[in-house]
Curated annotation (Swiss-Prot):
Catalysed transformations (reactions): dihydroxyacetone phosphate = methylglyoxal + phosphate
Protein name in UniProt: Methylglyoxal synthase
Originating gene: mgsA
Record keyword Transit peptide present: no
PROSITE patterns for this protein: METHYLGLYOXAL_SYNTH, MGS
Function: Catalyzes the formation of methylglyoxal from dihydroxyacetone phosphate.
Domain MGS-like: 1-126
NCBIfam families attached to this UniProt entry: MGSA (TIGR00160), PRK05234.1 (NF003559)
Keywords: Lyase
Molecular functions (GO terms): methylglyoxal synthase activity
């Protein structure tokens, strides 16, 4: 994936519908990018937008967050969009913190909510 444009998409369970809708609304822009996503999120995005190039990794609790973190560290991810659910307790909260830390450390654009994601998406392909 080196040299390509790649966006990582992750969404907590209560935000997966919002992520699928976000992808559907922005599929014209996302079509020019390769997408990696945690397993269930990637499946939901593909259901909404079957023509997008999506690589599904493991589910977040099974290591998908760490797979995306490793891709950030190797320079294979250019942007992270992670719709978090602040109202639901997360048993894998440390994974969220680790992923956020890597995005900050490697200085990649990161959105943790839909409003920020919409603004970031508008900067692509310009």
């Amino acid at each position: 994936m080196a040299g390509g444009k790649c966006i990582a998409l992750i969404a907590h369970d209560q935000k997966k519908d919002a992520m699928a809708e976000f992808a559907r609304r922005n599929q014209d822009v996302l079509a020019d990018w390769h997408i990696v996503a945690t397993g269930t999120t990637g499946g939901r995005v593909l259901d909404a937008c079957p023509d997008l190039k999506v690589t599904r990794l493991k589910s977040g609790p099974l290591g998908g967050d760490q797979q995306i973190g490793a891709m950030i560290a190797t320079g294979d991810i250019d942007m992270l969009i992670f719709f978090i659910d602040p109202l639901t307790p997360m048993p894998h909260d440390v994974d969220v913190k680790a992923l956020t830390r890597l995005a900050v450390l490697y200085d990649i654009p990161m959105a943790l909510n839909e409003a920020t994601a919409e603004r970031l998406i508008k900067t692509l392909n310009h």
